[in-house]
Amino acid sequence: MLEVASARDRDWAGALVRDNMAEAYRRHGLAWDPARFAADWAGGENYLLRCDGGAVGYLRLLRHAGRSYLQDLQVVAERRGLGLGTQALEQAKALVRGRGEAALRLKVFADSPAVRLYRRHGFVELLNEPPLIGMECRLP
């Protein structure tokens, strides 16, 4: 279940994103930028994914120009493959739909295994900006 993250959760969430994205960043010649993460945190809607009383993931939504973007969706390594990312994604879509918005957008590395997850949940490719692709899910 998603719950609003507090300021004290920022370091934990940042470490999760940094660790989960380390291989992709290395592959694409990028460096982790803690200042960028802090700025994104400050400008976004931050949620923890909780299961069995503990934090097992992190999700951030960003609203820009009247649209909502899924900026981060991370699950701790030992809890992947259990449907937690799917649950978080469906809850994020419900949040955005509840605001009356018609779509949720995101960017993801084109070579990320997450692309399959997003496609299974109705996201289609809108643009290709290597190494990223932009995707959108229309919300009924």
Identify the meaning behind each predicted range:
Residues 75, 81-94, 116-120:
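Conserved acetyl-CoA-binding loop-helix of GNAT-fold acetyltransferases
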Residues 38-48, 55, 69:
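A short helix-loop-beta-strand connector motif used in the catalytic cores of GNAT acetyltransferases and
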Residues 77-80, 105-115, 131-138:
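Conserved beta-strand-loop-alpha-helix junction that forms the acyl-donor binding cleft
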Residues 45-48, 58, 72, 105, ...:
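Short hydrophobic/aromatic beta-strand element in the GNAT-like acyltransferase core
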Residues 119-129:
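Conserved acetyl-CoA-binding loop of GNAT-fold acetyltransferases
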Residues 8, 14-41:
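Conserved GNAT-fold acetyl-CoA-binding loop/helix
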